[in-house]
């Protein structure tokens, strides 16, 4: 794997456990600041479903040999610099940082075929520049009814847009007609962002 990465070391990235949406926003911000020419090739990807019960494997918070966990949603960063090259940067995975798209999807999501329909994963893919402008969260989802924190928040102020105080739900929602970006099933997601070497060879003939 080439070493020309947007984020050479995971230690260089802003990270707070259980705030994946903000961690990815910070990655987008870092690209805009240090590699602005690459921003149009970057995406924030939300994973969820109607019941907000999505199984993911190879996660640091997972259990057992397969490191599986069920989240209400998850967010990762994706860099798609060319049709045959797509890298996933997930700050919560036990896979390498980054990981090639096909390996990441295969090991993290496996297949929907063995899962009940209520556990099928859907993906909202949002261009990084759009995410930087439209994402806004006052972190209310991380507070208990008494106002205490479920998990300690980042030390920096909440990320707030100019037009909205808290729109996280619009990003987690997997209804195609609501929220920014495009929504895909697992198979559609793979079809749109993975081109096998065999297909690329055929197209180049």
UniProtKB/Swiss-Prot annotation:
Q: Name the domain of life.
A: Eukaryota
Group of enzyme by EC = hydrolase
Gene3D superfamilies, per the entry: Protein N-terminal glutamine amidohydrolase, alpha beta roll
> Catalyzes what?
N-terminal L-glutaminyl-[protein] + H2O = N-terminal L-glutamyl-[protein] + NH4(+)
Q: Which UniProt keywords apply?
A: Hydrolase
Which GO molecular function terms does the record list?
A: protein-N-terminal asparagine amidohydrolase activity; protein-N-terminal glutamine amidohydrolase activity
- Keyword field contains Hydrolase: yes
Q: Which family does it belong to?
A: Belongs to the NTAQ1 family.
UniProt function note: Mediates the side-chain deamidation of N-terminal glutamine residues to glutamate, an important step in N-end rule pathway of protein degradation. Conversion of the resulting N-terminal glutamine to glutamate renders the protein susceptible to arginylation, polyubiquitination and degradation as specified by the N-end rule. Does not act on substrates with internal or C-terminal glutamine and does not act on non-glutamine residues in any position.
> What interactions and quaternary structure are annotated?
Monomer.
Protein name listed in UniProt: Protein N-terminal glutamine amidohydrolase
What lineage is this protein's organism placed in? Eukaryota, Metazoa, Ecdysozoa, Arthropoda, Hexapoda
